């Protein structure tokens, strides 16, 4: 209804969720989810028989994406948001477009092979994500005494890891591989650890 009435859809995108939705070097939003979202916009335009449907792009974070959909600030969110029962009670989801496991990114020579190796160490994850919730629960349940750092986005999480302020970055494996690919020396890094969840 909003698209038909206004001729505009506001699309929420991520700034650093490689390979799903992120800025390229020219500050254009690109990625797998972004491409799918633009196809969905074309579908809406055709279904509503609109001659023109404008789009407005708005950056969102893991912490605010659900709220911005709920309050109508954005019409569609395009990123790597996990479709789970808790979130289905809050917002609607498209059909599944990816399946991932939650793992660790660390330096190859860090000695970190799996989650038990994180006991007593600094670990970073991105605020507002399923990974953050899982990591905090693991820390409490297993009394691992990790110092958990919650960064604002995946780029900041990787920077925290890269600068040595954390020994590992816990996140969806596809996103970890994306961060690893853009590193100065991708060969210095490894995605490791038993997947803590399988998510879509």
Q: What is each model feature region?
A:
Residues 4-77:
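Extracytoplasmic small-molecule ligand-binding "clamshell" domains
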Residues 36-37, 64-68, 157-160, 166, ...:
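Short, hydrophobic alpha-helical packing/hinge segments within bilobed ligand-binding/sensory domains
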Residues 38, 50-117, 194-195:
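Acidic, polar ligand-binding/catalytic clefts
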Residues 15, 98-109, 155, 173-174, ...:
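Periplasmic-binding protein-like
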Residues 26, 38-54, 131-150, 180-186:
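Ligand-binding cleft/hinge of the Venus flytrap
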Residues 27-35, 60-63, 125-129, 151-155, ...:
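Soluble non-cytosolic domains of exported or imported proteins
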Residues 8-14, 30, 116-132:
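Short loop->beta-strand "edge-of-pocket" segments that line small-molecule binding or catalytic clefts
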């Amino acid at each position: 209804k909003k698209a038909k009435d206004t001729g505009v859809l506001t699309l929420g995108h991520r700034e650093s969720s490689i390979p799903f939705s992120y800025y390229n070097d020219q500050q254009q939003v690109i990625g797998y989810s972004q491409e799918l979202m633009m196809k969905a916009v074309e579908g809406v335009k055709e279904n509503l028989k609109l001659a023109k449907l404008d789009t407005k792009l708005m950056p969102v974070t893991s912490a605010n994406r659900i709220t911005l959909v709920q309050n109508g600030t954005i019409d569609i969110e395009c990123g790597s948001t996990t479709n789970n029962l808790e979130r289905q009670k809050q917002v609607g989801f498209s059909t599944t477009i990816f399946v991932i496991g939650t793992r660790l990114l660390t330096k190859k020579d860090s000695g970190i092979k799996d989650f038990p190796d994180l006991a007593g160490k600094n670990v970073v994850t991105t605020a507002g994500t399923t990974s953050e919730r899982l990591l905090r629960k693991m820390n409490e349940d297993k009394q691992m005494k990790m110092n958990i750092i919650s960064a604002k986005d995946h780029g900041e999480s990787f920077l925290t890891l890269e600068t040595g302020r954390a020994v590992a970055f816990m996140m969806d494996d596809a996103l970890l591989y994306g961060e690893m690919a853009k590193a100065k020396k991708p060969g210095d890094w490894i995605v490791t650890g038993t997947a803590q969840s399988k998510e879509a």
